[in-house]
A protein has these predicted regions:
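Aromatic, loop-rich ligand-recognition surfaces of beta-strand-rich domains
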Residues: 643-706, 718-766
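Feature activates predominantly on carbohydrate-active enzymes
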Residues: 99-324, 365, 369, 468-472
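Short, compositionally stereotyped local motifs that mark structural "simplifiers"
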Residues: 52, 500, 504-661, 678, ...
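Bacterial Sec-dependent N-terminal signal peptides
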Residues: 1-26
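Contiguous, structured surface segment used for ligand recognition
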Residues: 22-153, 481, 497-523
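Flexible, acidic glycine-rich loops studded with aromatic residues
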Residues: 377-382, 387-392, 398-548
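Active-site neighborhood of glycoside hydrolase catalytic domains
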Residues: 270, 287-289, 294-390, 397-405
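Surface-exposed loop/turn motifs at beta-strand-loop junctions within extracellular Ig-like
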Residues: 119, 592-596, 741-743
Length: 766
């Protein structure tokens, strides 16, 4: 018996001896700390654990207590008394670390956890790190973290003009930012579609400008303007007392709120309330959707306009103590200024050569006022037009060019380019996602964002303050939808702005995120599951004229099941293991069965193997900047496009006709030629007027063998793909396609007169 007990002890000892020690890769903190060393042992949280805090950190202790109560239902004692008899405690402490105010140290030992910083802010960030460690387990790995952010500006934006978001959600949104150690909330309070901030000197801004007619039964771009006799009922606004409450709530979490008061454009809600500050005098109504171009702007030739705006900014600054005030400055269509006698007189008086310089005058005048009040101006990168205001900070959204220009001229910059930072873009396959404004920005692409452009020198790079994610709400009508568009992309953005570039690793991030979703689930956050969806791609072998199929997910370790006949996959369907050669045309469907009983949405694509696969394409015209897809072989790779023009399967030409010539390599019997076209009315994408097919034996002399007219009405607003086909029954080596563009958008279109797109995916030769 004693021998058996001895053997048991030896086996247990050997088990622990052979158990692998945890390393940094098993710690699932987001954003990833910049310095971390794993220790030995664990701190075990229990109901008797005390939270001890130094002077001034009582709120921090309360935050931590609440986080722990949420995770483990322990209501821990908090105290500012520390004694030598204390065991199993968490100590929050402000002390001299010879570091910056955002740096913190987190030291986890078997008997205690210590969070230290030079400032309460740093302690708060340490608490956010500990919060994530505690949520996953009561047993917390011993470690030491010394951490600080890479960038001083770490932000998220929220548009509450297009759809009003209640105060409770705004606070919840601030909590989201705090969880990821972000420090700036860019609050887009006003725009054409609604004024959301109470200004006591001008009550009609909220009495009139905060409300519009309800067109919730229509998509954003289909909404008709307010008709005579209709009563605006949709909207809302924040009282000044509510704003003060929100500002304090954010400050308690070390988040600065930067308000945005749009000018000189995007101001139709304000002009509806006070039309005398426009160029035409109105009348106006608050639009329930977006109509392009947005013609109205504040009159730059009227001094009363500036008095009006300065009064508004004065009340705004009384509510928001932020260093910065955002004045917009984007997308100002200057038609009204060109037609306005007062604006033209202003240009003459100030010796301004054009309306761009008039915009510069406008921004500089507002900046001078803000500087006189001890504030700094931020504007979208259009404020560069006509000359930048002396102390302005540029928010670069139209790519990085504006940010580069501003930084090279010595101005501070916040990077937020559409291609990496616009969270209103689709994050997955359009056919699987709720309707969005357009674009395509998956989680992994957000993570790959580098805010400092390579074009900048080390000295110029110092002007890049940081970056932010933008949440424009045209297609985000509810708070749960807002959460869906924000999460989990906010986690990727948080790591972009916090973690040093050399420590970032996409695979490591996705591994940590897989664990992090438990916290999101427990917080009941409606995060997108798009990272689990299967992406089906193809590789064209132009030598063997074969198509190889690949399947992948953004999430790690997928269990992908697929079918080739268009039926829904089950757990018993073939498991995807490696790329495979497609033997015949297929309607491929795939589902990722992940995390035990969960499954992704069903992905699908169609690949058609035809006589033109991998043929040589010559003399083709397509936009080689916006819609490159797979280049010359895109129309002969067998892959059909989805309903999303940005899925990488579509090519297009704007304003001009489409033509292409295909060399089959040898003379073949051709029965039929088809080509797929996309119609998306709201994105100015239309079917062609007609399709003509020509054939040739030698590539020199072509004959027309078929022509078909499009019969679908030009104003059809559904998004769909239409194949136009010609039965030809001919022998040919060369096939030539001609499709005529409608040229410009019809008069019924919101963007009438603009050059229209003709988009095509595959030429199918049978």
């Amino acid at each position: 018996m004693k021998i058996n007990n001895f053997l048991t002890i030896i086996l247990i000892f050997l088990f622990y001896l052979s158990s692998p020690a945890k390393d940094a890769n098993t710690i699932t903190i987001i954003p990833k700390p910049n310095e971390m060393k794993i220790g030995k042992g664990n701190f075990v949280l229990n109901p008797s654990t005390k939270i001890i805090y130094s002077q001034g950190l009582d709120k921090h202790a309360a935050f931590l207590r609440d986080y722990i109560k949420f995770s483990h239902n322990f209501n821990l004692l908090i105290t500012d008394k520390i004694t030598e008899t204390n065991k199993n405690f968490i100590y929050l402490n402000v002390k001299d670390l010879n570091s910056n105010s955002e740096e913190y140290e987190l030291d986890i030992q078997p008997s205690k956890i210590m969070i230290s910083s030079e400032s309460p802010k740093g302690v708060f960030y340490g608490i956010q790190t500990l919060r994530q460690l505690i949520h996953s387990s009561k047993k917390i790995q011993c470690l030491k973290i010394v951490d600080k952010p890479r960038f001083v500006y770490r932000g998220m934006h929220l548009d509450v003009s297009r759809h009003f978001m209640p105060k409770e959600f705004v606070k919840k949104y601030i909590d989201f930012l705090a969880m990821y150690k972000m420090n700036t909330f860019h609050w887009h309070l006003v725009d054409d579609q609604g004024w959301r901030l109470e200004i006591k000197k001008y009550p009609k801004l909220t009495e009139v400008g905060a409300w519009r007619v309800d067109r919730g039964d229509k998509t954003w771009r289909e909404r008709e303007p307010q008709k005579p006799g209709e009563v605006p009922t949709y909207g809302g606004f924040y009282t000044q007392e509510e704003v003060k409450d929100i500002v304090k709530y954010a400050a308690d979490r070390y988040i600065t709120i930067i308000p945005e008061i749009e000018m000189p454009g995007h101001c139709l809600a304000a002009l509806t309330a006070y039309p005398e500050y426009s160029c035409t005098g109105g009348p106006f109504t608050v639009p329930p959707g977006t109509y392009w171009p947005p013609l109205e702007a504040f009159c730059a030739g009227n001094d009363k306009t500036f008095e009006f705006l300065e009064d508004i900014l004065t009340e705004t600054m009384e509510l928001f103590p932020s260093k910065y005030i955002h004045i917009g400055g984007d997308e100002v269509v200057k038609t009204r200024w060109k037609e306005c006698p007062k604006c033209q007189e202003r240009m003459k008086k100030e010796n301004l050569k054009d309306e761009n310089e008039l915009q510069s005058y406008f921004v500089k005048r507002i900046e001078k006022f803000l500087v006189s009040k001890g504030r700094k101006l931020i504007g979208w990168d259009e404020i560069l037009e006509g000359g930048l205001a002396p102390e302005a900070t540029v928010m670069s959204w139209r790519g990085t060019i504006g940010g580069i220009e501003a930084a090279k001229s010595g101005h501070d910059v916040i990077m937020t380019p559409t291609s990496y930072c616009y969270f209103d873009y689709y994050q997955g396959n359009l056919e699987l996602e709720p309707i969005a404004i357009g674009g395509y920005l998956p989680l992994t692409k957000v993570y790959q964002f580098e805010p400092i452009p390579e074009e900048l020198s080390n000295e110029e790079a110092k002007h890049i303050l940081g970056a932010q994610g933008n949440v424009w709400a045209e297609f985000i009508p509810t708070t749960t939808h807002a959460e869906y568009m924000v999460f989990p992309r906010i986690a990727a953005m948080a790591e972009v702005v916090w973690t040093n570039k050399n420590l970032k690793d996409l695979k490591d991030f996705m591994s940590r995120l897989a664990h992090h979703t438990k916290l999101l689930d427990d917080l009941k956050i409606n995060y997108a599951k798009s990272m689990y969806d299967v992406k089906i791609t193809s590789i064209l072998d132009t030598i063997k004229k074969q198509v190889k199929v690949e399947m992948s997910t953004e999430a790690l370790n997928p269990d992908i099941r697929y079918t080739l006949d268009g039926t829904e996959p089950t757990k018993k369907s073939p498991k995807y293991k490696e790329p495979f050669i497609l033997k015949k045309s297929a309607k491929i469907h795939a589902i990722n069965f992940y995390d035990k009983n969960k499954k992704s949405k069903e992905s699908s694509t169609e690949i058609v193997l035809h006589k033109g696969i991998a043929s040589i394409v010559t003399n083709i015209n397509y936009d080689k900047k916006r819609y490159i897809a797979k280049g010359l072989y895109n129309i002969v790779d067998g892959v059909r496009g989805s309903l999303n023009q940005n899925d990488g399967k579509w090519q297009g030409v704007q304003g001009n006709d489409f033509f292409a010539t295909i060399d089959l390599g040898e003379v073949k019997n051709i029965k039929k030629v088809s080509i797929g076209f996309l119609q998306n009315y709201h994105f100015s994408i239309f079917l062609p007027r007609d399709l003509e097919v020509l054939t040739s034996l030698d590539g020199k002399e072509f004959k027309s063998v078929g022509k078909v007219q499009n019969t679908i009405p030009i104003d059809e607003k559904k998004i769909f793909v239409k194949d136009l086909s010609c039965d030809i029954n001919d022998k040919a080596r060369f096939i030539q396609i001609k499709a005529s563009n409608i040229g410009v958008n019809p008069d019924t279109h919101p963007d009438k007169g603009f050059k229209s797109w003709l988009m095509f995916d595959e030429i199918i030769i049978e």
